[in-house]
């Protein structure tokens, strides 16, 4: 029986939602992830230190007492965020980053930033205190094709930010294009990126060919196969600039299977198992541990986890759905087989 033991991984980008959904989302993310960067796009969003810390308390309350999972909190940036709020958040030791959502770019992003120039005093403060900037890298101009919005964002917004703030650590989250891979590779060492399991395993054909599959619909949207191959090459390259971030984003079943369905794919039920499948297919299982367990912690300036988990190559069938609050969430690979499972 083939097995793989790796240092306990972390998830550097996950959505847990709020309220009674936390009982289910925290259960899934805390099964074997040591830490996770928690997205702040709630309703209303966690725009200040106090709301982020209150959200952290609700997450901690939802996990079992013996579970050592640690939520790492994030501020939601708006046009009204102040440099003083950044300093206050950093001083807590519990808020590790601030998130740039271009207004309207994704779920619950209507309060996001309308112009990057509005943020420059805040970005200066972040660079001073050592707080990371997390970026949803898409423009929201409706005249820009949805498949081009990441590329245009890199060219028109992020390139200038990287130039203007050489001491600011920036994570370009859930990258989806060869353009983003090239951008990060050419950028200085203060720029890195997360890559999701579903963008490694799937491309837009999986979502659109032979019928629309709404559970593959996420933002940034799945791209063509050539971009998928660039992501696989980046993730398995051994470059410290790329690390695990699931962007697992739960939506109730009827909100996905709808005439105007929500964007987001749920992968927290089997995150490391999905990554293992992608890395094995690329002949790079030996690169999984660093991608999942080392590079993210190193970039954030946090210690690596010291304990381990073990995966075994034993196929199992993913349930058709999982409980979410008083409803159900349909995960990636629902009703299908997965090759790997965590056994300890």
Curated annotation (Swiss-Prot):
The active site is at 247. It comes from Shewanella denitrificans (strain OS217 / ATCC BAA-1090 / DSM 15013). Its cofactor is Zn(2+). Keywords: Hydrolase, Metal-binding, Pyrimidine biosynthesis, Zinc. GO terms for cellular component: cytosol. Catalyzes the reversible cyclization of carbamoyl aspartate to dihydroorotate. It catalyses: (S)-dihydroorotate + H2O = N-carbamoyl-L-aspartate + H(+). This is Dihydroorotase. The modification N6-carboxylysine is found at residue 99.
